[in-house]
Amino acid sequence: MAVFVDLNLTNCTTVKKLQSVIEMAAHLGYSAVAINHIAEFEKKKPEIVKPISTKDLFASPPTVQGKSTPIQILKRLTVIASDPSHFNVLRSTSPVTRLYDIVAVYPKTEKLFHAACTAIDVDIICINVTEKYPFFFRRPPVNAAIERGIFFELIYTPAIKDSTLRRYTISNALSLMEICKGKNIIISSGAEKPLELRGPYDVATLGLLFGLSERSAKAALSTNCRAALLHGETRKTAFGITHTVKKPQTLEDEGEAAEPASKKAKKE
């Protein structure tokens, strides 16, 4: 049985509102959700807040529909980047990113999109679905992101709110599919209210309109999401990796190494 995941629930203004969205996700059959904390540096006082804890939301998380296990609640950071300096917080040495299970970036220009695909240490690149894309997707950066294990995210909430936004969502999704061929795609809700959520199989059907095959549409809600989470774990683990260095030889060791094998045998 597939394990469905929604990696983008908007961090609501009130705890009660967020609780109701998570409860609806569990009722619809999602096994895990990520609360999305957005950092927008264009604001006068940009701030990356500490992610909300599961304990602050539920004493006991709601049980997933059709299963006996509670829903898993993850933490996600999305940085809206309109300038190269906004990527500084995404460095692997940044203590901020280690607080989150998933780190995403929303690049506003083609140059920033290229940098996110080829050089920036993130798990997800967000695709704008609310307006006509300001540039064309190109194969080299998209392929580079796929090779690095980075995923591209499409959100479906705008498509169910407004007919104009639906056209932009489908158009931008199809443009991306022409380049990536359905690889490394994630579909999330971006929901702020319970009624904006849709069941996993309904979302997979919507994925067909985005140009995905039936198999790829299902993967965009399940296996690809788990792969993105694994990428996030690896990113955090890599921060603490230590390098092993060959022990330097002492003069005595060097002397022994220089002796012929026959001479060593006589000594023994």
Positions of predicted regions on the chain:
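Charged catalytic cores and adjacent phosphate/nucleic-acid-binding surfaces used
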Residues: M1-I35, F41-S68, S94-R98, K111-E268
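Hydrophobic alpha-helical segments and helix pairs
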Residues: T69-Y106, E110
